[in-house]
Regions:
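Cell-envelope and extracellular/periplasmic
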Residues: 25-473
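Bacterial Sec-dependent N-terminal signal peptides
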Residues: 1-28
């Protein structure tokens, strides 16, 4: 059995490698650039940025940028070439000239600023005009999207590596922004408005996809022994090359073409499709983050959106997935989580309020990457202490203080028998005191422990607290 499954995996990986080789051989360019480089693009500022392409094997390539940088290289025996361009602080527009003999390519309207990769499933893919009314204040937002220094590149949803050549960078205006990821656009807009510098977004997202599809085969194999046995066995099944949820397929087709483009960090909105295997999610997300950083060889920031409340089915426990996401903050360095416990829609897994999703992701970047003196997160469970018949809960990220919106509902406590009961909660000295007459000797506490829940705990900055269980610190 083991030999057979290893054979299937070998065939799958061989197909991907051969398909990439066939695509390269079919183009046979005298000089070409990777499609991720085009007019209107944004380079990461103050960075050494790779720029790559193909040409006749053994020929000389010269790249000259109008900000004063020049680089030369010779193509390898396969015709591949990569140069490194050092960028100054933000600015532009610039142009870049690439020459090989008599062949020449010129990139125009190139900006230098901050570049972020946006990835995930449908709530990241969700376009500004996905459907009528799909975004709060949709018509107003599209009509007023006039930001010449916000640019986006959409990696096409393509399992065969064919469509990427049809893509290019787009400037944010009412005509182009309709095809922008709403979450990523509002993230970029917040950064741009606060810093007044160019912002570039590389959007590589696909609705309904699981985290395993975005993780490399090597990393999944490394994680195999640490995750649930039923889940691990799925690694060994024959691969379906037409399924975007096939393990590692989006890593190969949607992520790898962007590596090693110079980026500042990653924003990630995914998890709804992994609710059924919530018990593995913290391991999988931690592993994927570390894997991506290894692929880029950069310890970049990684900020993710906690999935929003939604009714799901009675058999699913999305609160467990939310808590798995929260746990990643404690095990994976340079991560942050945008808490969305107040913007869920009971009947729609896709919240219309993408503005606050983008803004809360941007708060993390503004504080942690750009040094803004702001509160960047809602309250996060820190610890609890058993008092005389009640539990006192402490939180990080309380900002200017804790507040309740309406009744401070959603808290439950349990004794040593593990049976939870609704509890009364009140804020005292920026801590939450929780008690129930039905639990004489409380041991554990949890908050927002439902598929759908409307947040009641906030900090004074208006950011909601995360659901949590003290069993999973």
């Amino acid at each position: 059995m083991k030999t057979i499954t290893q054979f299937y995996r070998f065939i799958f990986l061989l197909f991907l490698c051969l398909q990439s080789k066939i695509n390269a051989q079919n183009s046979s360019p005298e000089l070409s650039l990777s499609p991720i480089f085009s007019n209107h693009m944004v380079f990461q500022q103050n960075n050494i940025n790779p720029l790559w392409g193909e040409a006749t094997p053994g020929t000389n390539i010269m790249v000259k940028a109008t900000w004063g940088e020049t680089s030369k290289v010779k193509t390898d025996k396969s015709g591949n070439w990569t140069v490194k361009l050092k960028t100054p602080s933000y600015g532009g527009p610039y142009s870049i000239e690439i020459k090989s003999g008599d062949n020449q390519i010129e990139l125009d309207d190139v900006l230098i600023g901050e570049v972020w990769l946006a990835s995930g499933q449908s709530n990241m893919e969700w376009k500004m005009n996905h459907c009528s009314g799909c975004i709060d204040n949709q018509d107003y937002e599209i009509t007023n999207a006039n930001f010449t220094e916000i640019r986006m590149f959409n990696v096409p949803m393509d399992l065969y590596g064919i469509k990427i050549n049809d893509q290019n960078w787009k400037v944010a205006n009412p005509q182009n922004v309709t095809d922008f990821s709403a979450t990523a656009y509002f993230f970029a807009r917040e950064l741009h408005q606060k810093m007044d510098i160019p912002i570039g977004i590389i959007n590589t997202s696909w609705g309904g996809t699981r985290i395993e599809a975005w993780t490399s085969p090597k990393k999944l194999n490394e994680l195999g022994p640490t995750i649930h046995i039923n889940h691990r066995e799925k690694f060994l099944k024959p691969h379906d090359l037409n399924d975007p949820n096939e393990y590692s397929i989006l890593y190969h087709r949607m992520l790898k073409p962007t590596i090693p483009f110079g980026i500042k960090g990653v924003i990630w909105y995914q998890g709804e499709s992994n609710v059924s295997n919530y018990y593995d999610y913290s391991v999988l997300l931690d592993g994927m983050i570390r894997d991506w950083r290894s692929q880029w060889n950069v310890d970049f920031s990684f900020y993710f959106a906690q999935i929003a409340p939604y009714i799901y089915s009675k058999k699913k426990n999305s609160q467990e997935l939310r808590d798995a996401q929260r746990k990643v903050l404690n095990i994976t360095p340079k991560t942050g989580m945008a808490i969305l416990l107040d913007i869920g829609d009971e009947n729609d897994i896709h919240p219309r309020n993408k503005q606050d999703v983008g803004k809360r992701l941007a708060l993390l970047a503004l504080k942690r990457d750009y040094g803004f003196d702001i509160i960047d997160s809602g309250p996060l469970y820190s610890k609890h202490e058993i008092k005389n018949g009640y539990i006192e809960v402490e939180f990080d990220h309380i900002g200017s203080g804790l507040i309740a919106r309406g009744e401070l509902a959603g808290f439950e406590i349990a004794g040593s028998d593990g049976a939870y009961f609704p509890a009364n909660a009140k804020i005292k000295n920026d801590k939450v005191h929780v008690h129930s007459n039905r639990v004489e000797k409380p041991k554990n506490v949890r908050y927002g422990w439902k598929n759908y829940f409307e947040a009641t705990l906030f900090n004074l900055e208006g950011l909601p607290g995360s659901s949590f269980s003290s069993i999973n610190p």
